[in-house]
Swiss-Prot record:
N6-acetyllysine carried by residues: K26
SUPFAM superfamilies per the UniProt record, alphabetical: L30e-like
Biological process terms in GO annotation: antimicrobial humoral immune response mediated by antimicrobial peptide; cytoplasmic translation; defense response to Gram-negative bacterium; killing of cells of another organism; translation
Phosphoserine: residues carrying this PTM: S10, S16
Protein name: Large ribosomal subunit protein eL30
Gene3D superfamilies referenced in this protein's UniProt entry, alphabetically: 3.30.1330.30
Main location: cytoplasm
Length: 115
């Protein structure tokens, strides 16, 4: 019971931080652009939906590991991630280039353990 409440609270805080990034920061949505930003070394944090295809997920994790970029596994599916970003379409992957006023990058490292 307590764990469910904690995950809901952390999900809400992630969603509010994501909305702040969408308003004040720079980001790219989608697999191809995310991969491009990781390879260029511009991505500060990558967020993946939980129903992202395994091959895409492993490829992004591999490139992020090479570029020493943090990867956060979003607890919702791609529809919920798109809604959290304020979009009316599905978002499987997104890369945050500049967080703007949000402290999303500082708040993530405790949740994104490098494997």
């Amino acid at each position: 019971m307590v764990a469910a409440k904690k995950t809901k609270k952390s999900l809400e805080s992630i969603n509010s931080r994501l909305q702040l990034v969408m308003k004040s920061g720079k980001y790219v949505l989608g697999y191809k652009q995310t991969l491009k930003m990781i390879r260029q070394g511009k991505a500060k944090l990558v967020i993946l939906a939980n129903n992202c295809p395994a091959l895409r997920k492993s490829e992004i994790e591999y490139y992020a590991m090479l570029a020493k970029t943090g990867v956060h596994h979003y607890s919702g599916n791609n529809i919920e991630l798109g809604t959290a970003c304020g979009k009316y379409y599905r978002v499987c992957t997104l890369a945050i280039i500049d967080p703007g006023d949000s402290d999303i990058i500082r708040s993530m490292p405790e949740q994104t353990g490098e494997k």
